[in-house]
Amino acid sequence: MVSLSDYLILSSVIFCIGLVGIFVNRTNIITLLMCVELILVAVNTNFVAFSHFLGNEVGQIFVFFILTVAAAEVAIGLAILTLLFRNRGSISVDVTNSLKG
């Protein structure tokens, strides 16, 4: 039987992979978005694990809201990146630092 600590260890590993990915690769925006999504998956895993082991469905319902916000975040982020690539020809972080508002 899988225990709560197994889920927490898995979630911690996924969270750390996301953090390391953000700190190591700061040049590609798509990779940064993927690492943020890994962090959100780790948080969702914690919510589902605690919800299951405590016998409460609130954590699982909260995961649906997080997934909805994450999907909207990715859609808007990719739309911005598409426009940035069309206008600048690159999606590097260095290009976004030169944007004027």
UniProtKB/Swiss-Prot annotation:
Keywords: Cell inner membrane, Cell membrane, Membrane, NAD, Quinone, Translocase, Transmembrane, Transmembrane helix, Transport, Ubiquinone. GO terms for cellular component: NADH dehydrogenase complex; plasma membrane. Its EC number is 7.1.1.-. The chain crosses the membrane at residues 4-24, 29-49, 61-81. It is found in: Cell inner membrane. NDH-1 shuttles electrons from NADH, via FMN and iron-sulfur (Fe-S) centers, to quinones in the respiratory chain. The immediate electron acceptor for the enzyme in this species is believed to be ubiquinone. Couples the redox reaction to proton translocation (for every two electrons transferred, four hydrogen ions are translocated across the cytoplasmic membrane), and thus conserves the redox energy in a proton gradient. This is NADH-quinone oxidoreductase subunit K. The gene is nuoK.
